[in-house]
Design a protein with these regions (language model features):
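Glycoside hydrolase catalytic-domain context in secreted enzymes
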Residues: 1-98
Length: 98
């Protein structure tokens, strides 16, 4: 199987999108990511990343939806619904944080 990686859409960082606290934007971003995956022949995406970034030295906190568990949950929920509505299976990552 060959996956075309020549053209890719890039969104702003997840944490910045969640700071807008606009559910429709989170859902639309998920749809756009899902459509890109489907267009490239990908059935399952390893995302979104749901780590709440409790430890600042973690280094990848910008990938998540922020440190608030409720806001992170809503952000992930809307993103997953958007991705899956486009026909790709979402697989939330890093959900449990020690």
């Amino acid at each position: 199987m060959s996956i075309d990686t020549a053209l890719s859409w890039f969104s702003t960082q997840t944490i910045w999108v969640n700071c807008r606290w606009k559910r429709s934007l989170l859902r639309a971003r998920g749809v756009a990511m899902g459509k890109e995956h489907v267009g490239k022949g990908v059935n399952i995406t390893l995302g979104p990343m749901m780590n709440i970034g409790r430890a600042p030295q973690g280094g990848r906190n910008w990938e998540g939806f922020g440190p608030d568990p409720f806001l992170a949950g809503v952000g992930a929920y809307e993103t997953i619904l958007g991705m899956q509505s486009a026909g790709v299976q979402a697989c939330a990552k890093h959900y449990i944080n020690k």
